[in-house]
Amino acid sequence: MQLNTLKPAEGSKKNRRRVGRGIGSGLGKTAGRGHKGQKSRSGGFHKVGFEGGQMPMYRRLPKRGFVSMTRRHVGQITLNDLAKINLPEVDLLVLKAHGFAGEQINAVKVIKTGELKIAVTLKGLTATAGAKAAIEAAGGKLVELA
């Protein structure tokens, strides 16, 4: 097999249907749109949610709730992930730089999955009770930012 002899699989490449190009094509005259009516006209289709003049569902139901613009997006990080970073001090910016927290994340909680053998100082992060005990047992500490 050579690159210049490669061909697409049989039947995998179909030609685009050219409608409205004579009766011999099988898709001439009405071009698959049937006879008359709104759907046969160019630009003749209703907007999304239109129910033929009946009061549409999205207007029959009441408005409800809102999306808070100041919502906290909390991420999670495990003790195994902290061990992979292998730095003495870790904060949110370090986690973002190493790809452990996404762009939208504005708070991170450490959970106890795996084990930590190095002393790590966590700045501005929260932790579960088990994770906090494991971090302190390894010689690390949690520092709250004011």
Swiss-Prot record:
Cellular compartments per GO CC: cytosolic large ribosomal subunit
Gene3D superfamilies per record: 3.100.10.10
Ranges of Gly residues composition bias in the record: 21-31
Keywords: Ribonucleoprotein, Ribosomal protein, RNA-binding, rRNA-binding
InterPro entries referenced in this protein's UniProt entry, alphabetically: Ribosomal_uL15, Ribosomal_uL15/eL18, Ribosomal_uL15/eL18_sf, Ribosomal_uL15_bac-type
Record's subunit section: Part of the 50S ribosomal subunit.
NCBIfam families given in the database record: rplO_bact
Family matches, as PANTHER family: 50S RIBOSOMAL PROTEIN L15, LARGE RIBOSOMAL SUBUNIT PROTEIN UL15M
Annotated family: Belongs to the universal ribosomal protein uL15 family.
Protein name according to UniProt: Large ribosomal subunit protein uL15
Source organism phylogeny: Bacteria, Pseudomonadati, Pseudomonadota, Betaproteobacteria, Burkholderiales
Gene expressing this chain: rplO
